[in-house]
A protein has these predicted regions:
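N-terminal amphipathic, basic-rich helices that act as targeting or association modules
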Residues: 1-82, 246-248, 253-260, 277-280
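Cofactor-binding active-site loop characterized by glycine-rich and histidine/acidic residues
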Residues: 43-164, 317, 334-335, 340, ...
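A glycine-rich helix N-cap at a beta->alpha junction
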Residues: 88-98, 163-177, 198-201, 404-416
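Glycine-/acidic-rich phosphate or pyrophosphate-binding loops and their flanking alpha/beta elements
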Residues: 262-265, 297-298, 316-331, 347-353, ...
């Protein structure tokens, strides 16, 4: 039998299928995703949960005229398949390949580039307002998960949508999870709604039955609508949304395409914003993902039979952080941990298992997490806030205003710093050195290897002011084990003493700098290699010492050049006479796409081979310039 999936070549092909063919298509898409992602890795569990819902949306909408905005966007794989991108899935999240998130440059059926949480309603509402002001006619649908509803931005947008009263469909994809199980009052509220699922089915059934009564049926429906407001407080499950000014429809079975089609048509007939509450099952159709959905959030390539990873690496920096936090939990009763819905991802799961009353998962609410930690610190506790670098950007004002301005002892464990690889622009942590370094009272550190991360965390918890420690995704570096001088505030570590060329490396770039140093030695140079440890405060004493017998200072960081470590060093030397030349190795002023970290470092010319070549060229230019000076 010919596969239905083979008929899907471009957007709107799904409209040619019968309902039974769509149901077969859903199973074929699941089979395809399970097989394909076992080779490439990717966000499996969330995508398996929205297959029927996505097909129903594609039967309802007309692409690219209508606009579908995905919150976060990691669950848009079925959408990509239905818009003609199935053949590219072998390249998913690889260098130059298919993105794991919606990308407007990839398809005109992708309405908005996403990657972070709780943004879809705001973006969709903006499209709605633009549509109406320009007198255009198309549908806008925003899909947001129940986990994303723990983020305050979603409520700001819902409030605005209710005020504007524009025709706008919002789908709440409720699978009871973000990455892990949701927390907080909204989660409890949605639990209550799920228990009342028959309400919408009953309401629609009564309305249809009344309309069939000759002559008086429509009048009875009108009367029912006029009186329902007095009783719906007792029975309606979505009262919170109704009270905000939105029409609530649901809960609806997110795996029943017939029911989904009916409720989408009903939403289209309504005036004003409509929220459709859809119940889905994360990982549906693949037993390992249903049992362990968090493990299959952003899965590495896996064995289909077991769901286990095809390869297991050495301990990561996150693993090291996890181990140290558990040890601190044993010894220091005032140490507490704060997570913004990323407990397993940041390595806090074991800490939470051992000390559940000292782990605070606040949901997808980075701004709240930081100010909450400020309050914990004021109350005499020692909070450690573990957040991915790209998500910490969302709380810049809170770090500056609520923590740094009051000089509070909050430790920021900044995970996934630098280039993270396959998730691309939205997830690289390339800006933290710049925005954290500009904040008064903030200390900024970066470890060269796994032992230094442990030492830095111990040092940070002892401080009486804010400290940020940034470390990368992936396996922790185990080289330079013998270089473990005690951590001193603002002091760097000289790994090799040389002359003429000094390489000042930050954090993960020390590993690269070690290879660069060896390459330069093979070319006849004797470079000095420095592990900076601190980006703020800088080791000014060391910088002055290096002036004496070095003509070229090369800084290396896995951060954007603008406002970063290198520019700070350049500013220091620029204010002094007879200073060495400074050259910066950093990420240029552009967003870095997805791909392997190795490929991306080469693209950015911050890998060891590229840096060696650049230093040799700079040194050659410097020598030519010296030769041209008049005697």
């Amino acid at each position: 039998m010919r596969m239905i999936l083979e008929k899907i070549k471009e957007a709107n092909d799904v409209k040619k299928l019968s309902l039974s063919e769509c149901e077969q298509l859903a199973q074929e898409i699941r089979d395809f995703l399970i097989q394909s992602l076992s080779e490439t890795g990717g966000h499996l569990a969330s995508n398996l949960g929205v297959v029927e819902m996505t097909i129903a949306l594609h039967r309802f909408l007309h692409f690219p005229e209508d606009k579908l905005v995905w919150d976060v966007g990691h669950q848009a794989y079925t959408h990509k398949i239905l818009t003609g991108r199935k053949e590219q899935f072998a390249t998913l999240r690889k260098t130059g390949g298919l993105s794991g998130f919606p990308k407007r440059k990839e398809s005109d059926c992708d309405a908005f580039d996403t990657g972070h949480s709780s943004t879809s309603i705001s973006a969709g509402l903006g499209l709605v307002q633009a549509r109406d002001l320009k007198g255009e006619n198309y549908q806008v649908v925003s899909v947001i998960g129940d986990g994303a509803l723990t983020g305050g931005m979603a409520y700001e947008a819902l409030n605005n949508a209710a005020e504007l009263k524009k025709n706008f469909i919002i789908i709440l994809n409720d699978n009871e999870m973000s990455i892990t199980r949701n927390v907080g009052g909204m989660s409890s509220y949605l639990d209550h709604i799920r228990m009342a699922a028959p309400y919408t089915e009953l309401k629609m059934g009564v309305t249809n039955a009344l309309k069939k009564i000759p002559k008086v049926g429509d009048g009875m429906v009108d009367a029912l609508h006029k009186t329902k407001s007095s009783i719906k407080q007792l029975v309606i499950p979505g009262m919170l949304f109704e009270n905000m000014g939105l029409t609530y429809l649901g809960p609806v079975d997110g795996h029943d395409m017939r029911q989904l089609g009916k409720v989408l048509q009903e939403a289209k007939r309504k005036q004003g914003p409509v929220l459709i509450h859809v119940l889905t099952e994360k990982g549906r159709g693949y037993e390992p993902a249903m049992r362990h959905p968090a493990r299959f959030h952003g899965a590495a390539p896996y064995e289909i039979e077991t769901g286990l990873p095809k390869s297991k690496g050495n301990p990561s920096y996150t693993d090291i952080f996890s181990t140290v936090m558990r040890k601190f939990g044993d010894r220091e009763p005032d140490v507490v941990a704060v997570s913004a819905a990323m407990v397993p991802g940041t390595g806090l799961k074991r800490f939470g298992n051992m000390f559940p009353e000292r782990l605070f998962d606040v949901g997808i609410a980075e701004e709240h997490a930081v100010t909450f930690a400020a309050g914990l610190a004021l109350g005499g506790l020692r909070p450690v806030v573990a957040i991915y670098s790209s998500f910490l950007q969302r709380a810049i004002d809170q770090i500056l205003h609520d923590v740094c301005m009051q000089n509070l002892p909050v430790v920021f464990a900044v995970d996934r710093a630098g280039l993270v690889g396959s998730d691309g622009e939205t997830h690289h942590g390339c800006f933290d050195l710049s925005y954290l370094s500009m904040m008064p009272n903030m200390t900024v550190m970066a470890p060269k290897n796994k032992w230094e991360l442990s030492d830095m965390l111990k040092f940070a918890i002892r401080q009486k002011s804010p400290v940020a420690i940034r470390y990368p995704r992936g396996e922790a570096y185990t080289g330079l084990e013998d270089h473990r001088a005690p951590i001193e505030m603002g002091k760097a570590e000289i790994l090799e003493k040389g002359k003429e060329i000094a390489i000042l490396a930050v954090g993960n770039m020390v590993r690269t700098a070690v290879q660069v140093t060896e390459n330069l030695r093979n070319c006849g140079y004797e470079p000095t290699l420095v592990n900076m440890r601190f980006v703020k405060p800088l080791d000014m004493d060391l910088l002055e010492i290096l002036r004496e017998d070095h003509s070229l200072i090369v800084t290396m960081e896995e951060n954007v050049k603008s406002g970063g470590f290198g520019e700070q060093v350049m500013t220091h030397y620029g204010s002094r006479l007879h200073s060495p030349a400074v050259r910066i190795v950093a990420i240029e002023d552009k967003f870095v796409p997805h791909g392997s970290v190795e490929d991306l470092m080469h693209q950015q010319q911050i890998d060891s081979a590229s840096v060696t070549e650049r230093i040799l060229r700079w040194k050659e230019e410097q020598q030519k310039s010296t030769e041209q000076l008049p005697e």
